[in-house]
Structures are given as structure tokens and as C-alpha cells.
UniProtKB/Swiss-Prot annotation:
Annotated protein name in UniProt: ATP-dependent RNA helicase DBP7
A GO MF label: ATP binding
Keywords: ATP-binding, Helicase, Hydrolase, Nucleotide-binding, Nucleus, Ribosome biogenesis, RNA-binding, rRNA processing
UniProt gene name: DBP7
Misc. comment: Present with 1460 molecules/cell in log phase SD medium.
InterPro entries per UniProt: DEAD/DEAH_box_helicase_dom, Helicase_ATP-bd, Helicase_C-like, P-loop_NTPase, RNA_helicase_DEAD_Q_motif, SPB4-like_CTE
Pfam families: CTE_SPB4 (PF13959), DEAD (PF00270), Helicase_C (PF00271)
Subcellular location: Nucleus, Nucleolus
Enzyme Commission designation: 3.6.4.13
CDD domains: DEADc_DDX31, SF2_C_DEAD
Domain Helicase C-terminal residue range list: 414-607
Domain comment, as recorded: The Q motif is unique to and characteristic of the DEAD box family of RNA helicases and controls ATP binding and hydrolysis.
Record-stated family: Belongs to the DEAD box helicase family. DDX31/DBP7 subfamily.
Classification of source organism: Eukaryota, Fungi, Dikarya, Ascomycota, Saccharomycotina
Length: 740
């Protein structure tokens, strides 16, 4: 088509495409009918097939691979792989063939991958042990009772000495008790008591207080007033000191202790305070609460308070109780003390601070609370590093993240087998497994206590006895009785449950006779608790501070007894943690290999039954290779995660909480515990999870959105709304003060 412009003589030519015009006409707008019909007709005109509702896109498979598929993939691992096409240069124009666009598939929430336990692990750099334990060296029991000394030589009365020998089975003092009791009785200075864990610090400050009260020669009752206030960082430690005080008070029944801790009814505590108490033991928050709001407690303190003891001072500061302690001391110092009623007692309040360490914040607390104090240390100078007991055998195993769970199973199995061989039918073996968070405790407790339903509850749901037929630990057959009790303990449990669980774990009775007791717990059980006959402490998650490491392993090898401790570390940066804790282990440690020294002894010579197979198809006499047994055991736990939604929720919560807890290590230790260096997928394997970490995050977000949506009120239908509006109009019309 041409156009001639007569004004300027220009000739314009326009070229049009006939096919485009026809296509435009053919793709006219469709009118009439429903929008769905119009949409369907338009897609048919464009040559697209309408998608049927409910039809899924052909993406990845949502189902988990079966065990047979895993075995097939592992057996064909040596087969030749498909050749990989070399990458083309972005400047290569040799081919003009149009390449298909790259489609990025969306992340699937339920996609799962079964990975092998023993492949694709990070190399372990530590080959030789730089701090090897000398097994031939002579062991000196650093916190054992002294043979050549007695309590009566320190000025303790015969009544108290006899009670210690007969009722409490304590005949000899420890080194720290020998150093503390004489200056405590003189009451000339405040005291800073520094000693190893398990050396007897509790009796070191309780015995002089009892001796001072018994030496008064006056008629003492519970109404005579409170002589001592003991403040501890945790409820469990406060409860333990209360039990020791009550046991000591049996030789002088007129002395009454009182326990003030969170989680208990304040009304009951106030009633006990009104009746009178000679010893008050409690946690900082609850003690301050009563000092501020309970009038009778100040009346109890005025005539008799002479001793204020702060136990585990480093933990008090670590938990942020500095301001609370200052308020407690300000209130106490503001009370006018009557020295005429008990003239033989000290003329002022004697402050005592106990701690296993003498550096950092605890020194600051000592400067705040103590005046003209005397440092008493069990043979160690203040500048020296606190060391572990000499009779403690420390072991360290470097475990790839995928193998953490099965290695823990192997360790617990080995300890149980040792209990069967070396212990008698009445001996009790106790093992404590420390984990980083309460959700991880719940998961591991569920793994080892209720895998196949063969268990019986003892203390609510926090203690379970494994019964005959249990295949998870430590026997893998249907004929042997496991003789294992599993416990869990963490701060999220109620105080009554925590107390009952700890009491059951620490008591030797018919229920625990001849059994292996396993306690899964957080650091709530790492401070000051004197649990009898703890043979092994397992630190599956490294502590958040080196002081916590000392207190954790201090639950064993107490009062001259032998003990073992096992620390789990990951390959890579965490291996440097060994050099960091080396000064605290002058006797060295044993470096174990996870495969040959942990897994092989536990799983060799067995035939672990697969849970997806019938018992009739299982030949228990046909032994399998140890690595096959370990893999089967772990896959059994993974199948349970798939089949049990509640157990899967515990696994996901445990994994996510473990990641968050891992990021809270002290800044000085970040070079060993760096979150960026973790392989999150392999770590998820240790929680028996097959999902990718991103999928778990999306699942949690989707679950939270669903929970929020379920809380929304249902939409009101038109009929209900009309009736509601009519009733509202009637009420307004009947109101005589309606001016609308």
C-alpha cells in the first residue's frame, strides 16, 4: 500500500502481514456463557489442553525410597555412570539450534532422600592423640576422703560424728572439708570455697553451721529463727541441699529446714515460714519474692541469721542472677540483727561463696558479696586452671554428623553389655547423656524408650522400663530382658515431675535393682547434683562453655570413685576443641574411632531385624556384618519417623532446636562451633529425617499458617447475620434512651 503526499512530494510505502491479520480475526473475543467455558474454549483455540482438577504435575516423586531400592542403589554404586556432557562456552556459536528453557522445579515439602550412613562424610583430620592417657600411670584419687583424719578432730560433736558414721555412712572428711571446717568455726572472715566437683563442698559449709547451733547450749525450736540462708542457681541443687540438711537434722530433730523454689505453691511455702524454719534453702527468684512480700520471713531472720551461703557462684552469675543477689543482700543487710538472744553466734553475718572455678564473673560476685574474705582451695592456687578429678577417664570420639545417633546407640549398648558381664544382679549402673536442648532430649528419649511399644511407664511419662521383646536397646531379640530404664529431665517439665524423676533415678530400690539407668537431660542436671554410682557421662552435644564441661563430667568420679566420660565431636573445626580443653585434662584422654572402637563392638555378631519384615522371615541366628546391622538399626528409626506423625514432629522439633542451640556458643568458642560449617542435611540424618532442611522450614511455616487459620472464627452465613441484625434493631427500638 502506498500513500502520496501532494504537499512535499514524499511517497510512503507500508507492508502488512496477511497471516497476522487473519490470525487477529480468528482470535476474536469469546463472549457469552460461563467464564469456565470461555476459558476452556480459549485454551482449545490456542492448542493447550485444559488441566483436570486434582491432576498433579509430573515432578519429583513424593514417596520415600524403599529399603530394596536403597540396597539396589548401593549394590550398583560401582556401575558406570552416564557420560557428562562437557560445558559449552558462552561464546560458542557453533550451533544455532534453540535450546529448551531451563525449568526450575518448585521445592516439594514431602520429597525424601535415603542416604547411606557410611559415605560422603567429611575427613577426620586428627590422626594421632596429642594428649594421650597413660594407662600405666598411678592414679591418685584427688577428691577422695582422707584416711588419717576424722571429723571429731575438727571440733565436731560426738553426736554429729556418730550420725555421720551410722546414718549417712560418712566416716572420713575430704580434703576441702578439712580445710574449710576449722576456719568456718572461728568465723573471723568471709570464705571463698574453691574445690573440684564431687569433693564435698556441701558438707563443708553445713557441718560448721550445725556445730555452731548445737554449741549454743540453749533451747532451740523452729520458732527460734532462721540461722542460715542458702541460695543455689537451680531447683534440683536446692532440693538436694534441702535433703542433705534434713538428713543432718535427724540427729537434732528440733532443727527444721525450709525449701523455697519456683514451681511450688507460694501459699504452702508461706505456711511453712509462719510455723518457723531454722534453715532456708532456695533459688534466687523465689527467695527474693518472699523477702519482698512475706512479712514473717524478716521476723524470722532478725534474731538469728548469721550465715549466708551462695552455692555454685559461677552458675549464679552465668544465669544472670547478679542483680537479684544484690537485692537479696540489700534486704538482709537492712535488717537489724539482735546479737543478745544468741551471744555465742558470730556478731555479724558470715558470707560464704562456693564455686568450682575462681575466674570470670564469679570473682566479681565475690568482690560484691564478700568482705575481707579468705580463699580456701583444695590444693590449687587461684591462678591455676581447674582440672578434672585424676581418677576420671576421659574419652573423645569424632563422629560424622550422619552417624551421631547410631554411635550413641552403640555406646549405650556397650555400657549395658559391660553391666551384664561385670555387675551383679543387685548392682545399679547409671549413665547420663547430656544434650543441648529440651526438644532434643524428648526426641532421643523417645527413640530409646518406646521404639516398638515394649515398655512400661514408671514416673508418669518421664521414666520407662524396657520390657521383654524390646528391640531398640541393648538386646536385639525377643527372649532377653533388657533391664534398662530410660529417663528424661529438662527445664520444660513441671517441678513435681522433675523432682520425682530425679528421685527415682538416684534411689536404689527394688525398681532399679540390677538395672542400667539412662538419663537423657540438659544442663539442668549438670550442677552440684550428687547422684550415686554414675559410671559414665556422655556429652553427645558439646557444652556451651568449658565450665559446663567440667560440671557435666563432674557427675561421675565423685568422692574418690572411678568414672568415665565420653565427648562427641564433629569432624573439622570441632576437632580444635580438644586443644582448647587440654589444660583441664592433665592426665590426658583416649581418642576413639567411631567405627572400629564403638560401632563394631556393639553391632558385631548380631542380626538386627528390619521393622518392615515379619518376625517369621527373620533368622536371628544368622549374624550380619556390623555395618549392615548399624544401617538397619538406623533405617528402622527412619521408618518410624515416616509412619508416626507424632514421632516425626519430635524429630523435626529436636533438629530445629538443636540448630538454634548450636548458634549460642560463647564467642570465644565460635571458631570451633560455627553454624556455617555444619552440613545441615547430614545433621538431619542424625535425627532420622529424610527431608531436606528447607522442606522442614516450609513445613513448619505451613503448619503455623494452618494453626492460625484454624483459630479464625468461621464465616457467618447470611441467615444468622440477618437474625442478629434484627435482634439488634429490636433492642435499640426498645431502649427508652435511644436517641438515634
Amino acid at each position: 500500500m502506498s500513500f502520496n503526499d501532494d504537499d512535499d512530494g514524499m511517497l510512503l510505502n507500508f507492508t502488512t502481514d496477511v497471516s497476522d491479520a487473519s490470525e487477529t480475526v480468528s482470535r476474536g473475543k469469546i463472549t457469552g456463557g460461563k467464564w469456565k467455558d470461555r476459558r476452556k474454549a480459549k485454551m482449545m483455540m490456542e492448542g493447550r489442553k485444559p488441566r483436570v482438577r486434582g491432576e498433579k504435575r509430573p515432578l519429583e516423586s513424593d514417596g520415600a525410597p524403599t529399603f530394596e531400592e536403597l540396597e539396589a542403589s548401593s549394590s550398583n554404586s560401582t556401575s558406570a555412570q552416564a557420560p557428562v556432557e562437557p560445558k559449552r562456552s558462552r561464546f560458542d556459536n557453533s550451533s544455532n539450534v534453540e535450546q529448551p528453557a531451563r525449568v526450575t522445579q518448585p521445592l516439594q515439602l514431602n520429597s525424601q532422600i535415603v542416604s547411606s550412613l557410611f559415605t560422603s562424610s567429611r575427613n577426620i583430620d586428627t590422626v594421632t592423640n596429642s594428649n594421650a592417657h597413660d594407662e600405666k600411670a598411678e592414679v591418685t584419687y584427688s577428691n577422695a576422703p582422707l584416711v588419717g583424719d576424722t571429723f571429731d578432730s575438727f571440733g565436731i560433736t560426738d553426736t554429729m560424728v556418730s550420725h555421720l558414721n551410722v546414718k549417712m555412712k560418712i566416716s572420713k572428711p575430704t580434703k576441702i572439708q578439712k580445710l574449710v571446717i576449722p576456719p568456718f568455726l572461728q568465723a573471723q572472715n568471709d570464705l571463698f570455697i574453691h574445690a573440684q566437683t564431687g569433693s564435698g563442698k556441701t558438707l563443708a559449709f553445713l557441718l560448721p553451721i550445725f556445730q555452731s547451733i548445737l554449741s549454743l547450749g540453749q533451747n532451740i525450736t523452729r520458732q527460734s529463727g532462721c540461722f542460715a540462708l542458702v541460695v543455689t542457681p537451680t531447683r534440683e541443687l536446692a532440693n538436694q541441699i534441702y535433703q542433705v540438711t534434713s538428713e543432718l537434722a535427724q540427729c537434732c530433730h528440733f532443727l527444721v529446714p525450709c525449701l523455697l523454689i519456683g514451681g511450688e505453691r507460694k501459699k504452702s511455702e508461706k505456711a511453712r515460714l509462719r510455723k518457723g524454719a531454722n534453715f532456708i534453702i532456695g533459688t534466687p527468684g523465689r527467695v527474693l519474692d518472699h523477702l519482698q512480700n512475706t512479712k514473717v520471713i524478716k521476723e524470722q531472720l532478725a534474731p538469728s541469721l548469721r550465715y549466708v551461703v551462695l552455692d555454685e557462684g559461677d552458675k549464679l552469675m552465668e544465669l544472670g542472677f547478679e542483680e537479684t543477689l544484690k537485692e537479696i543482700l540489700n534486704i538482709i543487710h537492712g535488717i537489724d540483727i539482735d546479737t543478745h538472744q544468741f551471744p555465742k553466734l558470730p556478731k555479724r553475718i558470715l558470707h560464704v561463696l562456693c564455686s568450682a572455678t575462681v575466674k570470670g564473673n564469679v570473682t566479681k560476685l565475690g568482690n560484691v558479696t564478700l568482705q575481707n574474705y579468705k580463699l580456701i582451695s583444695s590444693g590449687q592456687k587461684q591462678t591455676e586452671t581447674t582440672t578434672v578429678p585424676d581418677q576420671l577417664l576421659q574419652k573423645i570420639v569424632i563422629v560424622p554428623p550422619k552417624l551421631r545417633l547410631v554411635t550413641l546407640a552403640g555406646s549405650l549398648t556397650t555400657i549395658t553389655q559391660k553391666h551384664y558381664k561385670e555387675g551383679s544382679k543387685s548392682d545399679v549402673t547409671r549413665t547420663i547423656v547430656f544434650l543441648s536442648c529440651s526438644d532434643s532430649v524428648d526426641f532421643h528419649y523417645e527413640v530409646f524408650s518406646s521404639h516398638d511399644g515394649n515398655h512400661r511407664g514408671l514416673v508418669g511419662d518421664t521414666a520407662r522400663l524396657l520390657t521383654k521383646g524390646n528391640s531398640i536397646l541393648p538386646c536385639f531379640n525377643d527372649t532377653d530382658d533388657p533391664n534398662v530404664i530410660c529417663y528424661k529431665l529438662h527445664g520444660s517439665l513441671s517441678q513435681q515431675t522433675r523432682t520425682a524423676t530425679l528421685k527415682h533415678f538416684a534411689t536404689n530400690n527394688d525398681a532399679t535393682k540390677g538395672k542400667h539407668l539412662i538419663l537423657f537431660c540438659t544442663d539442668v542436671a549438670s550442677r552440684g547434683l550428687d547422684l550415686p554410682h554414675v559410671s559414665t557421662v556422655i556429652e553427645m552435644d558439646p557444652p556451651f562453655a568449658v565450665e559446663d564441661h567440667l560440671h557435666r563430667i563432674g557427675r561421675t568420679a565423685r568422692a574418690g570413685c572411678e568414672g568415665e566420660s565420653l565427648l562427641f565431636l564433629l569432624p573439622g573445626e570441632e576437632e580444635g576443641y580438644m586443644d582448647y580443653i587440654k589444660p583441664y585434662h592433665p592426665k590426658g584422654w583416649k581418642l576413639l574411632t567411631y567405627d572400629e572402637q564403638v560401632l563394631r563392638p556393639a553391632f558385631e555378631g548380631l542380626n538386627v531385624r528390619r521393622t518392615d519384615k515379619k518376625k517369621e522371615d527373620w533368622d536371628k541366628h544368622e549374624a550380619q556384618a556390623w555395618d549392615n546391622n548399624a544401617t538397619t538399626w538406623h533405617l528402622n528409626v527412619e521408618r518410624r519417623v515416616i509412619e508416626d506423625s507424632h514421632f516425626k514432629e519430635l524429630a523435626v522439633k529436636g533438629y530445629m532446636s538443636h540448630i538454634r542451640a548450636y548458634a549460642t556458643h560463647l564467642s570465644i568458642e565460635k571458631k570451633f562451633f560455627n553454624l556455617k560449617c555444619l552440613h545441615l542435611g547430614h545433621l538431619a540424618k542424625s535425627f532420622a529425617l529424610r527431608e531436606r532442611p528447607k522442606s522442614m522450614g516450609l513445613q513448619q511455616g505451613k503448619a503455623g499458617a494452618a494453626a492460625a487459620a484454624s483459630q479464625k472464627k468461621p464465616k457467618e452465613d447470611s441467615k444468622s447475620k440477618m437474625l442478629r441484625m434484627a435482634k439488634m434493631a429490636m433492642r435499640q427500638s426498645n431502649d427508652e434512651f435511644n436517641f438515634a
